[in-house]
């Protein structure tokens, strides 16, 4: 019995497709999407109007490549514990679909392409910041903090807060206060987001001896910390509008409503810190929170946004 030519062709194509999918999964694309949304917010806030399409596309691609490189290196370092944790054991490296040397070559290629593209199409500051983000995430967070400190996310969150700086720098060639406020927003958003996840999979982290906060101090104390960071996040988001004046009433209203809802959900979690459904709900909302907040920045920066902001400001009772 022999295979037809169509069958012989189909099997190699399926293998290639499976391998491409494995590399795609290695980069953690859902995380990249969220990082690129904050990059776009940084660009929009810096431009305060229409963006050069070529610059915008190049910056997003370059930022995406940098994030993919960082995530791949993270997967390389964590492949031993990923093989044990229920949530991660089927990732490409622990499952054997990609070999470590292949992942190394892939990650370094992505990092090099990111730097070259950002340096060519944007500027050296944007390229340098993206590279610094990779180094910070891999060396400081993944190697230095993740397995050794319960504050790993608090300090390591700075790596995830670099993309809006890259976006701002790509447009202006420098950094200013609004960019640093965006940086602070993402830094303060990170602990509630990841600690909510840690509450959901606390046993997994305990099994591999990763000292996430719920493992070290328990669920109740973690929920209180989530509430504290949510409380700090609200005035920080509003600082973009006042006193900096970098965002308008539409953003302000969105930030206020989102911040109050995050506080409400965090308070609910404090009342039932062992509730995984509440932790899951908070985790999912935190993703939508950051997406909508960045979307509000973009809306305020679009052509015609001043008239929209004026209409909102004139609304009775605003």
UniProtKB/Swiss-Prot annotation:
InterPro entries for this protein: Protohaem_IX_farnesylTrfase, UbiA_prenyltransferase, UbiA_prenylTrfase_CS, UbiA_sf
Record-level GO cellular component terms: plasma membrane
Location relative to the cell: Cell inner membrane
Superkingdom of origin: Bacteria
UniProt KW Cell inner membrane keyword: yes
Catalysis performed (reactions): heme b + (2E,6E)-farnesyl diphosphate + H2O = Fe(II)-heme o + diphosphate
GO molecular function, one term: protoheme IX farnesyltransferase activity
Keywords noted in UniProt: Cell inner membrane, Cell membrane, Heme biosynthesis, Membrane, Transferase, Transmembrane, Transmembrane helix
Record EC number: 2.5.1.141
Membrane-related topology note: Multi-pass membrane protein
Top-level EC class: transferase
Annotated family: Belongs to the UbiA prenyltransferase family. Protoheme IX farnesyltransferase subfamily.
Function statement: Converts heme B (protoheme IX) to heme O by substitution of the vinyl group on carbon 2 of heme B porphyrin ring with a hydroxyethyl farnesyl side group.
Protein name stated in the entry: Protoheme IX farnesyltransferase
Originating species: Synechococcus elongatus (strain ATCC 33912 / PCC 7942 / FACHB-805)
Gene: ctaB
